[in-house]
Amino acid sequence: MKSIRCKNCNKLLFKADSFDHIEIRCPRCKRHIIMLNACEHPTEKHCGKREKITHSDETVRY
């Protein structure tokens, strides 16, 4: 199981084996985080590429 942490303040947000789409607001720093296509053993074929996009409204995509 993988620990998912906020990239801004490093707070543990949740633990998961895999997921397709997660939207969460960090309870500590209030940053809005969107995570797409992550799995325990990521491959481009099964999980897609992970990328980080930062917007002016403090939304972060991984």
From Swiss-Prot:
Known consequence of changing residue 26 to S? Answer: Loss of transactivation ability
The cofactor named in the record is: Zn(2+)
Cellular location(s): Host cytoplasm
Keywords, in A-Z order: Activator, Host cytoplasm, Late protein, Metal-binding, Transcription, Transcription regulation, Zinc, Zinc-finger
User: Is Ubl conjugation a UniProt keyword of this protein?
Assistant: no
Q: Which Pfam families does its entry note?
A: Zn_ribbon_Com
Q: What is the effect of changing residue 6 to S?
A: Loss of transactivation ability
Q: Which residues bind Zn(2+)?
A: 6, 9, 26, 29
The protein's job, in short, is: Trans-acting positive regulator required for mom mRNA translation. Binds the com-mom mRNA 5' and destabilizes a translation inhibition stem to expose mom translation start signals.
Family of this protein: Belongs to the com family.
Annotated protein name in UniProt: Translational activator com
